[in-house]
A protein has these predicted regions:
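Conserved redox-active cysteine motifs that mediate thiol-disulfide chemistry
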Residues: 92-112
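Short pre-active-site segment immediately N-terminal to redox-active cysteine/selenocysteine motifs
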Residues: 86-88, 93-96, 161
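N-terminal targeting signals for export/organelle localization
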Residues: 1-69, 198
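Thiol-based oxidoreductase modules, predominantly thioredoxin-like and allied folds used
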Residues: 116-131, 141-151
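Thiol/disulfide oxidoreductase modules built on the thioredoxin-like
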Residues: 134-141, 148-198
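A short beta-strand-turn-helix
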Residues: 58-60, 65-88
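Hydrophobic beta-strand anchors of alpha/beta hydrolase catalytic cores
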Residues: 89-90, 120, 165
Length: 198
């Protein structure tokens, strides 16, 4: 069998990203792996203990606060600290990430279903602002979506996989995270528990 080139092998495991920012992606990914335990207090648990949502991790500790500009011009800044009192679904995405785009309709549907009870916030990083804005418009996402230009918030949350969804309790403490694409049913399972606890 012919040997694959280095570029072909890399493309099998890494989504295509904008060329100017690929080097930064590699740096924060390594740093995120090193910080995954310390940054957000990740504790791996079995799926059974988390309502059988595949790929979820239980989290401990307080969510790191941030204030970032919204991807869309003219909107107020996105400040996590101001969202306490209700659970928060924090979704990390990028315009070049296919699974991120596929899950957006489910996230939007759930944001409408739980309106007034749960906050939904997107965070785009390692991305171009214009491209991220276009994706939000194309997929009909209306909840706040922050622009993380230096990937600082992604590093704080030790994001290793795109997309990643972090669930935060009404008290501002981390609860769970889902690495990779999430479905509407999986969102309901976790969010219902958050709402019951708040």
């Amino acid at each position: 069998m012919p040997r694959r080139s280095e570029r072909e092998s890399r493309d099998l495991i890494e989504p295509e990203a904008p060329a100017p920012r690929r080097r930064r992606w590699g740096w924060w990914l390594v740093a995120g792996l090193a910080l995954v335990g310390a940054a957000v207090g990740v504790a791996v648990t079995t799926d059974d203990s988390l309502g059988k949502v595949p790929g979820t991790l239980k989290l401990t500790g307080e969510a790191k606060t941030f204030t970032l500009d919204d991807v869309r011009s003219g909107r107020p800044p996105v400040a996590l600290e101001g969202l306490r009192g209700r659970p928060v679904v924090l979704n990390f995405f990028a315009s070049w990430c296919g699974p991120c785009i596929r899950e957006m309709p489910a996230l939007q549907a759930m944001s409408e279903h739980y309106e007034g009870r749960v906050h939904f916030v997107g965070v785009t990083f390692n991305d171009r602002r214009e491209a991220a804005r276009d994706v939000l418009e194309r997929t009909g996402v209306t909840y706040p979506s922050a622009f993380d230009p230096d990937s600082d918030v992604a590093l704080d949350y030790a994001v290793r996989v795109m997309p990643t969804t972090v669930f935060i309790g009404a008290d501002g403490h981390l609860v769970e995270r889902k690495d990779g694409e999430i479905s509407e049913r999986q969102l309901r399972t976790v969010i219902d528990r958050l709402v019951d606890r708040s």
